[in-house]
Amino acid sequence: IHLGQNDKSCSEAKKVFGKNFLVGVSCSNSYDLYKKAKEESADYVAFGPAFNTDSKNKEKIDLNIIRKFKSKLKLPFVLIGGINHKNLLSLKSLSPNYIAIINSLWNFKGGPIESAKKFRELLKELKNENDS
């Protein structure tokens, strides 16, 4: 279950759905929103949009802000927004636990399966670079 800032609180979602569901919270690029989500026992947090995107009418976040507080994060984090085959590897210094993709998956000229395969190869490359 993924919650935006205008949705129910994480603690409310946990009460309704119990422990059988993971609950994540969008934090834009705010360490304060991250701390609030952590206090409410979020299972993960999401930061974004990492790049300009057609899915959200929001300006992209400053990834340098995430870099500054990344070492303090105790929850897994997702980068979301505008991530595509061309810009994915530029996120390697952030080492996100997960990425969320929409448009670059569904709108890929070769179709979503080919896009997913390409992402899988890029993610292997990203993981290998981070393990070095």
What is each residue range found by the language model?
Residues 12-13, 29-43, 72-79, 83-101, ...:
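Catalytic cores of alpha/beta
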Residues 1-14, 21-37, 43-49, 53-56, ...:
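Catalytic beta/alpha-barrel core
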Residues 18, 62-64, 111:
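Glycine-centered helix-coil hinge/cap
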Residues 19-20, 74:
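A generic structural signal for alpha->beta connector loops
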Residues 56-62, 67:
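Substrate-recognition "cap/lid" segment bordering the active-site pocket of phosphatases
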Residues 5-13, 46-58, 92-122:
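Glycine-rich phosphate-binding active-site loops on the catalytic face of alpha/beta enzymes
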Residues 125-132:
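Extended, intrinsically disordered, low-complexity segments
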